[in-house]
Every structure is written in C-alpha cells, then in structure tokens.
Amino acid sequence: ILLTAILVGAMLLLLFLITGNSALGDLDERAEEALEYCKENGYSTDYCLLVDYGWHSGRVRFFIWDFNKGKPVMKCLCAHSYGQGSTARKPVFSNEIGSFCSSLGHYRVGREKTMSKPKGRKALVLYGKDKTNSNALKRGILIRPVSLPNFPIYPLLIPVKVHKVFGHKIRPKSEGCITIPFRKYSRVVETVKSSSKPLMLWVYE
C-alpha cells in the first residue's frame, strides 16, 4: 500500500511538472498578444492582468504580468462562476445579464469601489471591451477578494459551492466576478493604483 501511494504521488508530481511547463509557455505567448493589444488601445505597457480559465481550477490561473521583466510578478488561484451548469471542472461562459456566468474577453480595470454586499468590502470595477463581455458593468462584474487558499490545491478542484479544502473554507460566491484570495487582492490594487495608464485584464481559456 505504501509503495502504491508513493508511485501515485510520483506520477501526480510528474504530471504537475509537465503540464506546468507547457502552461508557462502558453502564458508567454498570451502575454505577447496582450502587449500588442495594450499598445494599440492605450493601456499600460508595464503590467497587465491575465486569467486562464482553461487551466485546472486547483492551479494558479490569475497573473499580474510584468512586461518589462517578461514574467508574472504575482499569481494565485481564481474561482470561476457557477451559472448555467458550470462545474468545478468546467466553467460555462456567457455575457447575458442574469446568467451568473464568467465572461471571456478584454476588460479595462477601473476604480476601486466599496460594495454593499458584503458590506464594506472593496472591489475593482471592470469594463468589458468585447462582444463576449460588453455587459460587465451592468452585471456588476468585479475583481474581488474571497476566501480562497493562497497556494495551489491541484489536483483538487475549487468547488463552485461552499466547501473545505485542507481546512480552508472556500466561498467563491462568483456570479461572474473574478474572485481571488484576500491576501493577493491588495497586490492587484497596488499595481492598478500605481499605474499612470489603465490596466488591461484579459480573461481567456
């Protein structure tokens, strides 16, 4: 039994390393595309935000990308929404009001606001710039902090309902919002507020 457990653990580690390397390569390519978009549309060419919903939800898939350094300077878990049959493994995307789905596309990151629910909590306003997310402002789509671990939980998945993982109570509560851990949110706000130009967020799969 012990030998079997060791072999399974080794296989999972190998799988993680292999998929991790391929994912980082894809991230580099996405960052190059993002830089061109930022140049053409007047966004910051120092930083952008990237979310890859094509990745396993137990892995980091939210990134602050530093164009000057050519690498992410912050990365963390990011929950997707639960609407229209979305599961922990596979999100469903929609731009419809009332769909409670995540939306793909480019966003302009706006000001930080104080939410009424949960009362007093801060969040960053998002403006959808594509046909796939044009209703973002009407839907109240935000970047906001929630109870998520500060570390990857792969091969476990982030559930779309309240659940516990490694003793951490996970409450994604996303109805389309980009939800990240509390401790990582402050770094995002700091990056947004220190920029002389608006930041672009790109959500893709």
Model-derived segments and their meaning:
Residues 1-9:
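N-terminal Sec-pathway targeting helices
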Residues 10-18:
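Hydrophobic alpha-helical membrane-insertion segments, chiefly the h-region
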Residues 20-176, 182-205:
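Cell wall/extracellular polymer interaction/catalysis modules
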